[in-house]
Amino acid sequence: MALETVTLEHLPASHKVYVALFRGVKNAAFLHQQLLARNPEFEYAFIDASVVVSRLQLLSAVFKATSTAVNGALRTPNVHSEIVCTMSSSNNIADAYRRYGISPSTQDLVVVKVTFPGEDGAEPLTQDQIWEHLKTNVEGEAVSITDEQISIATDVPKVRKYYKLNGLKWLDDIQDEKVKQKEMESLVIGAMALRGV
């Protein structure tokens, strides 16, 4: 099963986080339309994988958005849209959806689902139910969500543009690609953390 359960410290045990990565998605337009129609069966954070640099970046956004939801301070309709917005370094929600969320042209897709008991006491979906829904509705190859798989999908020029990392000569001068990747990851996470400050 390519849907991974992730445990994030300092979140209530009742909140479960599931993540998956799909490559070569053929029906991104359909999935995008489901979000626009606010179809409750498609309440996921659909993130364009081309703007994700690492698992740490992704999980930082998930943690921040879920903490915001737990504290009742969401700025968007739900925790999943909050995750997409938290990926951004700016406060512009529409811009965050456009840059970081799924679009009809998305090729590689990160999917995040956060479950928790409903206010009416309803049981949240299980990992198997979520995976079955994703397998049925996402036309793409599910792969493990590792830094290696993420880096294959990352569009570095796009990331540098969105996070305003162009023109950093010291970053360009780093010869070791792993070191450069780690430095870029730190800059991106820092930009996300400083959003709105």
Swiss-Prot record:
Keywords linked to the UniProt accession: Activator, Chromosome, Nucleus, Telomere, Transcription, Transcription regulation, tRNA processing
InterPro entries according to UniProt: CGI121/TPRKB, CGI121/TPRKB_sf
Name used for this protein in its record: EKC/KEOPS complex subunit CGI121
One term under GO cellular component: cytosol
Top-level division of the source organism's lineage: Eukaryota
Species per Swiss-Prot/TrEMBL record: Gibberella zeae (strain ATCC MYA-4620 / CBS 123657 / FGSC 9075 / NRRL 31084 / PH-1) (Wheat head blight fungus)
Cystine crosslinks: none
Keyword Transmembrane: no
GO BP term, example: tRNA threonylcarbamoyladenosine modification
Subcellular location: Nucleus; Chromosome, Telomere
PANTHER family per the UniProt record, alphabetical: CGI-121 FAMILY MEMBER, EKC_KEOPS COMPLEX SUBUNIT TPRKB
Chain's gene name: CGI121
